[in-house]
Amino acid sequence: MKRVCTLPLWLWLGIVSEADLVSSYSMTPPTLSITEEEHIINAKDTLTITCRGQHPLEWSWPGARWTPVEGRRRWNSQPQQRPVGAGNPEEDCEGTGTKPYCKVLVLTESQANDTGYYHCYYKYIDAKIEGTTAVSAYIFVRDFEQPFINKPETLLISKKENTWVPCLVSIPDLNVTLISQNSLIHPDRKTIFWDNKKGMQVPTQLIRDSLFVQCETVIDNKVFKSNFFIIHIAGIELYDIQLYPKKAMELLVGEKLVLNCTVWAEFNSGVRFQWTYPGKQMQRAVIESERRSLQTHTELSSILTLHNVSQQDLGRYTCTATNGAQMLEESTDVIVHEKPFINVEWRKGPVIEATAGDEAVKLPVKVVAYPQPDFQWYKAGKLIPKQSQSSMQIKDVAEHHAGTYTLVLRNRLVGLEKRISLQLIVNVPPRIHEKETSSPSIYSRRSPQALTCTVYGIPAPEVIQWQWRPWMPCRMFSRRSLNSRHRAARRHQRDRMPECKDWKDVSRQDAVNPIESIDTWVEFVEGRNKTVSKLAIQEANVSAMYKCIASNKVGRDERLIYFYVTTIPDGFEIESQPSEEPIEGQDLQLSCNADNYTYENLQWYRLNLSKLHDEEGNPLVLDCKNVHHYATKMQGELRFQPDSNDATLLLTIPNISLGEEGDYVCEVQNRKTREKHCHKKYISVQALEIPRLKQNLTDIWVNVSDSIEMRCKVDGNHVPDISWYKDEKLVEEVSGIDLADFNQRLSIQRVREEDAGLYLCSVCNAKGCVNSSASVSVEGSDDKTNVEIVILIGTGVIAVFFWILLIIIFCNIKRPAHADIKTGYLSIIMDPGEVPLEEQCAYLPYDSSKWEFPRDRLRLGKVLGHGAFGKVVEASAFGINKSNSCETVAAKMLKEGATASEQKALMSELKILIHIGNHLNVVNLLGACTKPNGPLMVIVEFCKYGNLSNYLRTKREGFSPYREKSPRLRIQVQSIVEAVRADRRSRSGTSDSAIFNRFLMHKSQTVQPIQEVDDLWQSPLTMEDLICYSFQVARGMEFLASRKCIHRDLAARNILLSENNVVKICDFGLARDIYKDPDYVRKGSARLPLKWMAPESIFDKVYTTQSDVWSFGVLLWEIFSLGASPYPGVQINEEFCQRFKDGTRMRAPEYTTAEIYRIMLSCWHGDPKERPTFSDLVEILGNLLQENVQQEGKDYIPLNDSHSSEDDGFSQVPSSAQQNSDEEDFDMRIRCHSLAARYYNCVSFPGCLTGGNQIRCSSRIKTFEEFPMTHTMYKAHPDNQTDSGMVLASEEFERIENRHRKEGGFSSKGPNRTAELSAEQSDLRGRCRPSYGSQVGGQTFYNSEYGELSEHSEDRSCTPPAEGASPPALHASFFSEQY
């Protein structure tokens, strides 16, 4: 702290402040016995002065503690020795009533030098002010022999205008003259004044050049002179003062304190230093002075040193420097600590908030410590370099700066350390991501649309507001009018943006386009939780402007959407009539349709083949900007459609020829950007040829009332003119006679005798004609027809009566609502003979706003597999998961030339996929492309590792039965199984879709995959993997069963392997109506997957969930044989089917365990009601998976290994598995210690039952390997045999079927199975499980021959779908063959 002021001002301020202080005491000043201001005594006289006052008093006289200040006096604080006389001249005296204190000053033998001011003041009051706390009198001690009383001294002359020469006299009325080196100076009372108490004041210039001056007076003609005053010219200006160190000084007890007070003064200046500090009374400090005279100024220093500081030395230290005319002052604080310490605390709390885009944010921390510690800042445990201060500043704040920051303070010398943490929250203004990508502004009329705004901000915006306004221009305004915060939040916007008014909130009641829904949800995209809002428009009818608004506490963002509705897709297209491949001689019309709001300047061109290459023959880069260089302009007719605001440029080419084939280009220009756009259409002209018939007509013999059909099939794409003649007369379409397929087909219903004759088919075009004829002969009489008509009429009347009766009955019965029909798979709820599958699919909805995916964002790749009517292609989908990422998918589509029924079947499969929903272990639907002008495609998940059967075969060499159990593996398996149990317990209140999503979240957040994706091919296959595959398939089948879906072809070839060892079920026969489609009736070369089919499916055509359980058992056999074909070495013939019916089963596969084989046998139970449900299998395999992971050492004991002891059981179940089964109702942990592991045929069927203190095992299971079959060869067509033996020749199967009919159908209680299925047998569930039959009710399909419903059929051989058949949907291998 520095103070600078002149000395008079300083004294005046001090006097005023002290006067104010003393006035508060309300005291009276002391009084003297001498009342006059000047008192004269002679030398040698005795001076006696009495002083009285209200407080203790003390005297001061010349030479002792006083300083004259312009008539007001102040005194030094330290008394000096009395300059004259001996002893103490002060004595106490008796006071009075009002002034009880009295002190008398007695001065004997007075001398001339005693002349001066005598002061009496209050002793214990620091403020000594004349007339208030002090009183004085000037005493002249007159001595005619010593009129002058001064001693030799130096007279400092400064830059002042006048200088006082202190010639003090003992006689008041003397005439004094000043003698300088050059002249005599007499007082003139103008510029030169004499004062008998101060001396003589003269102009400085009169004595400045003299070496000395002297005063002179004459008394009685005797001259007296004073001592010499040596003239010394000195500077009076003090430039600056500094006290080092500048900051407050902190020390520990015992340390050394050094303060340096330095003054920079004018050259040749004199300065007096004075220190004020707490220990000044005890004079603890050592003060040293230094002086350095430089060329331009003088540097003076006073150094205060204090050794071994203590607590008493703390306080304010002040250095005062004065030269008589000016005074400077500087202060500092000294803090003394007893011991080292560190104290740290927050300045603004533990949480600091900032906004992304701020220039800087400071993390303030208050630190009080000594000695100064080391500062280190950390974020998330990592040291932040170049941050060594107590408060850290972050510049250009961004989102990644958010987090927890920790300041660590260390004093390594004394071992002290303190930490403090601050949480920095960086708020991010909302940003709408769709603004960064180009979005379409043209929308097709009468089409459903979805407008989406994906917003990211911190904090996340709670609500995204949608507004709309009519389609009209908006005025533009500059972004510079926005405030700084908005500018930071909208850096990606253009400098000018539209400002539109008259906005209205979007609502279903007040909307120019009907609104279906407004949904808002939070989605995890690109590592961030983003808020997504979707405005679903039912039908785009009117052009409008939409705006979505997102805001949070630090900002706001909005997206303006120009919703222009047009009848032209994408605003620009080319159409050709009649087709893109016209026939030679036809009239071709090309239409260039463009939206008039967006485009203008329509122009047709035809590319010149000769100009498409340069001089060297290299192909030119075609660009729309220079299309006129290599194309010929063609004239068209421009038309406008006011109702749709569309422009059409028509190009008509009459009687097109082969030479006019080529590329035709339509060029348009964007009205806003002035950029040109082009569309190209290649016109392929087909040469006109003479028509050709694929086959000629053949003669027909038909009975009366039957129907006939004749086909005149023409080869080629162009169908010529076809005419039918009967007996040279033109046949026209009348009642009973139908012409279809461009007259290629002639149908006659209920043939009569007059329909007999010669029929001629004539096919003609401009090149010529070709004919084919056939004779139709009618047998029988028309009388029989009349009888049949009567019968039909009577039957119709009866049918109408019963139909009305049924309507009345059904009106009184509660029918299921339309919403109820949508909840299940309708072919399961309703009898398929009553309501065909295609009619049920008509009830299922297709939400294009949710599932439709643009074809232009789908890039097709290699073909993964072919089916009978379609193919599966690997594709890359951009943004299919509502993000900007690219994802590999599988696209399922029909082959070229697909019929309408095939497209309808694929659409039905799409609807049922949507109805079933998503599940982790099912190949899920991702989207679809159903809009016209492109192929129908169903987009599903892509599984990179192919089907499970091929994968298992490739991993045989690397199979490792066991591996070291890790805690991570145990935790993962426990988490997966517990998640499944929790989902199953909460299934009554939670949808499968919610369970699926929660399971995925649980898997991604808490469970690390067993194997990483890149290591799946390199990692060995283990027993845990096989059980995990089985568990996942059971879980997926449980989901399909809950959705009323029957697979009918469950096999390893239809199980796909995806990342993280996740398996997915595919080709669940969704859109196959095997009861109505004639293509599924068994024909000569039909292929049936007999090895995977249940007995009731083979012999009774019954497909249920329990028949899928049988197939699951065969799938288990495939998994634990590592992809081997079922029934190895067994020929599929009549003997196989007979033994199959009698209960013969497959032996245990090579790599299975006893527990797994018992599960297989329970799935192969002859009675479907006794088989476990998929829910039971999920519970059993989940328990087995946990036990397998928790075991120590080897947990795999193959059934084929031989043991040295008969007592070695093969059911290795740990004792820890024997727990209470109250929560786990279906426990599979059962031991069969009485069986040796090598006797695998002694495994109980279907399982072992623990009863009492002993374990009973039922009779053995016969296997095909134990009782070899007799090889019987049957003649069959070559295409009926495959390497896998999975099919059976139709003739042989017909013989088995006929025998089966004679025996009365398939039964689980055949004569040869009494011993195997005794009452003592039990399945895997044990005593605590309910009957499996309770899970099957209401899900069985019955065919028309053996079931409850009847259907007349002469063939009577309706079979399950065969691999070679032609279903309305894609074949079962459609998915599996892709991998």
Swiss-Prot record:
TM helices/strands, residue ranges: 789-809
Localization in the cell: Cell membrane; Cytoplasm; Nucleus
Entry GO CC: cytoplasm; nucleus; plasma membrane; receptor complex
Disulphide bridges: C51-C120, C167-C215, C261-C319, C453-C548, C474-C500, C592-C666, C712-C761
Domain of life of the organism encoding this protein: Eukaryota
Activity control, per UniProt: Present in an inactive conformation in the absence of bound ligand. Binding of VEGFC or VEGFD leads to dimerization and activation by autophosphorylation on tyrosine residues.
A molecular function (GO) term: ATP binding
Membrane topology (UniProt): Single-pass type I membrane protein
Residues carrying covalently attached carbohydrate according to the record: N113, N175, N260, N308, N529, N541, N596, N608, N655, N696, N703, N771
Alphabetized UniProt keyword annotations: Angiogenesis, ATP-binding, Cell membrane, Cytoplasm, Differentiation, Disulfide bond, Glycoprotein, Immunoglobulin domain, Kinase, Membrane, Nucleotide-binding, Nucleus, Phosphoprotein, Receptor, Repeat, Signal, Transferase, Transmembrane, Transmembrane helix, Tyrosine-protein kinase
PANTHER family with a match to the protein in the record: TYROSINE-PROTEIN KINASE RECEPTOR, VASCULAR ENDOTHELIAL GROWTH FACTOR RECEPTOR 3
Record text on subunit structure and interactions: Interacts with VEGFC and VEGFD. Monomer in the absence of bound VEGFC or VEGFD. Homodimer in the presence of bound VEGFC or VEGFD.
Domain notes: The first and second Ig-like C2-type (immunoglobulin-like) domains are sufficient for VEGFC binding. The fourth and fifth Ig-like C2-type (immunoglobulin-like) domains are sufficient for homodimerization. The fifth and seventh Ig-like C2-type (immunoglobulin-like) domains are required for autophosphorylation and further activation.
Name the record gives this protein: Vascular endothelial growth factor receptor 3
Organism: Coturnix coturnix
Gene encoding the protein: FLT4
